[in-house]
């Protein structure tokens, strides 16, 4: 379970959100909504332990994330606006590197399959620097098919993804939640239309 307690964030003398509290349980799929500038990215970064807040706390499995960041990040997959991939490596090498850093053992056929899922079949050995921005983001998204982490925090994961790709990712997010994981995301795309499994948390306008 993830708990957000009395969270307040101020940026450039604006209160983005104040005394924000909610809980997210295993098996939940949550979309953070709000107009541009309401603090969606700020909130995700704070929850991921990558941003600061004026007051409040985040608890994961009833422990404050600040007290054991290493353990928390072992359970967390965060995908932000920056893809975190290495341009000098190929798509295949990037995923091998990611898995090694996170001490996961996955064979190459599974990596090839993950890249195929995001539409990069045949591009596995191309240096990332030669891929388009959308293709580079797909390399980062391929991690989702390989991850064993229970908590996914995804900031605009559908940027530059076509309609078919959105459908594939939507199915993956639902599957992760059905298996007891948690997905927290922001998106401007119309996903999960009328899906009862989706919970929405809306941020108000800054003060």
Swiss-Prot record:
Enzymatic class: translocase
- InterPro entries assigned to the protein according to its UniProt record, in alphabetical order: AAA+_ATPase, ABC_transporter-like_ATP-bd, ABC_transporter-like_CS, ABC_transptr_haem_export_CcmA, P-loop_NTPase
- SUPFAM superfamilies per the record? P-loop containing nucleoside triphosphate hydrolases (SSF52540)
Give the Gene Ontology MF terms in alphabetical order.
Answer: ABC-type heme transporter activity; ATP binding; ATP hydrolysis activity
The main place the protein resides is membrane
Kindly state which reaction or reactions the protein catalyses: heme b(in) + ATP + H2O = heme b(out) + ADP + phosphate + H(+)
- Any GO CC annotation of this UniProt entry: plasma membrane
Topology relative to the lipid bilayer, per the entry, is: Peripheral membrane protein
Which residue range or ranges hold the ABC transporter domain? 2-204
Q: List the disulfide bonds.
A: none
GO biological process terms held by the UniProt record: cytochrome complex assembly
Q: Which UniProt keywords apply?
A: ATP-binding, Cell inner membrane, Cell membrane, Cytochrome c-type biogenesis, Membrane, Nucleotide-binding, Translocase, Transport
Query: Pfam families given for it?
Result: ABC_tran
Q: What is its EC number?
A: 7.6.2.5
Its biological purpose is as follows: Part of the ABC transporter complex CcmAB involved in the biogenesis of c-type cytochromes; once thought to export heme, this seems not to be the case, but its exact role is uncertain. Responsible for energy coupling to the transport system.
Family to which the UniProt record says this protein belongs: Belongs to the ABC transporter superfamily. CcmA exporter (TC 3.A.1.107) family.
Q: How does it assemble?
A: The complex is composed of two ATP-binding proteins (CcmA) and two transmembrane proteins (CcmB).
Annotated protein name in UniProt: Cytochrome c biogenesis ATP-binding export protein CcmA
Which organism is this protein's natural source?
Vibrio cholerae serotype O1 (strain ATCC 39315 / El Tor Inaba N16961)
The gene that this protein is the product of is ccmA
């Amino acid at each position: 379970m993830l708990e957000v307690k009395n969270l307040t964030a101020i940026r450039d003398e604006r209160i983005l959100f104040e005394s924000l509290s909610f809980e997210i349980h295993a098996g939940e799929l949550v979309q953070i909504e709000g107009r541009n500038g309401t603090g969606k990215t700020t909130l995700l970064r704070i929850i991921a332990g990558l941003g600061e807040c004026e007051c409040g706390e985040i608890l994961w499995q009833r422990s404050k994330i600040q007290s054991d960041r290493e353990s928390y990040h072992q359970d967390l997959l965060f995908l932000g606006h920056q893809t975190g991939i290495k341009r000098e490596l190929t798509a295949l090498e990037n995923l091998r590197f990611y898995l090694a850093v996170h001490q996961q053992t996955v064979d190459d056929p599974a990596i090839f399959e993950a890249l195929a899922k995001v539409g990069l079949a045949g591009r596995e050995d191309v240096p990332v620097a030669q891929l388009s921005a959308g293709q580079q983001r797909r390399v980062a998204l391929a991690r989702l098919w390989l991850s064993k982490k229970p908590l996914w925090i995804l900031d605009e994961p559908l940027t530059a993804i076509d309609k078919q790709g959105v459908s594939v990712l939507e199915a993956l997010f639902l599957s992760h939640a059905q298996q007891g994981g948690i997905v927290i995301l922001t998106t401007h795309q119309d996903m999960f239309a009328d899906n009862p499994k989706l919970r929405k948390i809306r941020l108000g306008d800054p003060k």
